Amino acid sequence: MKKADAPARARELRDRIRAADHAYYVLDQPLLADAEYDRLMHELQALEADHPELVTADSPTQRVSGAPSERFERVVHREPMLSLGNVQSDDELQEFDARVRRLLGLPDGEPVGYVVEPKLDGLAVELVYRDGAFTSGSTRGDGVNGEDVTANLRVVGGLGANRGVPHALEGRPPPRVEVRGEVLLFKEHFEAMNRQLVRAGEAPFANPRNAAAGTLRQLDWRVTARRPLSFIAYEALLPGDDPWRTHWEKLEELAAWGFETNAENRRCRGLAEVLAYRDRMAERRFELPYDTDGIVVKVDDLDWRRRLGAASKFPRWAVAFKYPPQEEATRIRRIWASVGRTGVLTPVVDFDPVRLSGAMVARATLHNEDEMRRKDILEGDWVLVRRAGEVIPEVVKPLPERRTGAEQPFRFPAECPVCGARVVREEGEKVYRCTGAACPAQLVGRLCHFAQRRALDIEGLGEKLAAGLVERGQVKDFADLYAVPFEVWQQLFSRPRKEQDAGAARELPEKSAQNMVAALERSRKTTLRRFLFALGIPQVGEATAATLARHFGGLARVMDADEEALKGVRDVGPETAAEIRAWTQEPQNRRVVERLLAAGVTPEAEVVEARGPFAGKTVVLTGGLSTMSRDDAKAEIERRGGRVSGSVSRKTDLVVAGEDAGSKLEKARSLGVRIAGEEEFVRLLKE
């Protein structure tokens, strides 16, 4: 190629690759087959190697390089990334405004200038730029220490969303600047990504925040690159004195440097304007392209901010107002019984679709017959529904004043709706059970339980794939999963495609099948506690599985333990011991375990620390943690010899209280149980 033609060809290749990325990962409409995409990428790489002057900071070839990381390094923030205090009422907002005015010594009637913005529901990060170039990035972590996720942040916004992390700043940036903001998934991108996961046979994410947090903390940057994350900036910090007088000037400077800032940001003069903004945003919150659960109110004047300072956890110059949960009235269409892995029949409520927290919802579950009777839920009722925690659909209560007399109580079937076996409710139990040993619904549930992330973590094996395997007669127990032919996986991943998609469609089932085989291969190496939990032994949850693994130290000893030995295990009572013994002595169960071992599944005992602040302690987790997921926190405690319980009692040694901690925190206070915040919890993990 002539040198004069190289710049135009490089631009063309970059544009085509970006368009293909955007179409595949955001729009869910592949433009190119994988082979054609790889050819274009290789051509661009070769062209840039021959002409280094053509390399741009935002070229697809420059997103990141290198192998996946094995762990994230710790980063100490130059200035702490403090969380915000929460308020939920007008009175509390007025108290905040009054406190600001009092601390500043403002005369009565002089309004405070505020900047208000939607509270973004994503993951807070910090980006460091030197001489205009992006050099490093980290998560908020515990506010003092974060995790180095530079490689992943380099690919945020690499799918044409125009809301990414700039590799080079525009204009005249300072020698060093720290930019803070939120990594998030816009609703359209989240929905497209979930469609793609379902198409590949993988479990979709529950909400955009979980998806964004999980994606940014991937050890393999290539996973992050394939997902349409965005970044919105809201803060800039310099090592010396700020050249800005107001926060609003900072936001304007961030936009001039090439960052996306929130178009809904506003300046308000006084509390009355803040309340008016809050009301407008509450009405529009579900029309916005991203999830938001409130607004953030910040003092605009930076000199005033310095005078106000910060308390131990929160700045005194800012506060977050959180919206109350949205509730809607709807009418129940029907109540029916769903069959789970243990044969338990769970009442499911189908109702007229309603929009809750930005999503259409048409179904919720009731735990059992007693809950249904306690709430007085009837078929045909008008009810109030909400999404608990903005995620899980929940029937709150009926609206008896709207009853017509045609409503009827739901009665559990006498026969299983899936296999036709007898349904029973044993004396003393709250649930109805299917007695069919070969019930397909139970097998599908057991397979999903076996494959879930906290068990053997077989990525991509969800309910639809499990049902397909059962329908084809390929799988009758866990061990059969490891003998499913590659061609069967291909068939399960195949689906009709439009003619114009044929090039990509031919490769998709094979690639998805390869991913499934790889996931099964990875699952062969596991821990004893995960393996015991995956087996679905009655009354053996994660905590009991971990306790059994620590006590016995090997699978053979668990399988051969008699009731007396089992009763000698901490927190294993006579009933649980009897259930475990009955399960391990059932010949069919022993055959499944033997076949799993023969298939190469190797459950190994973990080395548990015998000393340290968690050794031998019972810990309860409540509220949300910003530094890690609940599952990760639980695993860290158990690795250090602790036990995680779901309820607070006098036997509880420690309660870890995160954001929005609830009744467990109150009970811990009433019982005098030691309480640790997230910062102290992270410190204890390091001891």
Swiss-Prot record:
Residues recorded as binding Zn(2+), renumbered to this chain, are C416, C419, C434, C439
Keywords attached to this Swiss-Prot or TrEMBL record, sorted alphabetically, are: DNA damage, DNA repair, DNA replication, Ligase, Magnesium, Manganese, Metal-binding, NAD, Zinc
Origin, by domain of life? Answer: Bacteria
InterPro entries hit by this protein: BRCT_dom (IPR001357), BRCT_dom_sf (IPR036420), DisA/LigA_HHH (IPR041663), DNA_ligase (IPR001679), DNA_ligase_AS (IPR018239), DNA_ligase_CS (IPR033136), DNAligase_adenylation (IPR013839), DNAligase_N (IPR013840)
Which Gene Ontology terms describe the biological processes this protein takes part in?
DNA repair; DNA replication
Q: Where is the BRCT domain?
A: 609-687
Q: What residues does NAD(+) bind to?
A: D34, A35, E36, Y37, D38, S83, L84, E117, R140, E182, K298, K322
* Catalytic activity annotation: NAD(+) + (deoxyribonucleotide)n-3'-hydroxyl + 5'-phospho-(deoxyribonucleotide)m = (deoxyribonucleotide)n+m + AMP + beta-nicotinamide D-nucleotide
Q: Which GO terms describe its molecular function?
A: DNA binding; DNA ligase (NAD+) activity; metal ion binding
Entry annotation: catalytic residues: K119
Q: What class of enzyme is it?
A: ligase
Q: Per its Swiss-Prot or TrEMBL entry, what cofactor is needed?
A: Mg(2+); Mn(2+)
Instruction: Provide a GO CC annotation, any one.
Output: cytosol
Its signal peptide is none
Keyword NAD assigned to the entry: answer is yes
Q: What is its EC number?
A: 6.5.1.2
Functional note: DNA ligase that catalyzes the formation of phosphodiester linkages between 5'-phosphoryl and 3'-hydroxyl groups in double-stranded DNA using NAD as a coenzyme and as the energy source for the reaction. It is essential for DNA replication and repair of damaged DNA.
The family classification in the record reads:
Belongs to the NAD-dependent DNA ligase family. LigA subfamily.
Protein name as it appears in the record: DNA ligase
Q: What is the lineage of its organism?
A: Bacteria, Pseudomonadati, Myxococcota, Myxococcia, Myxococcales
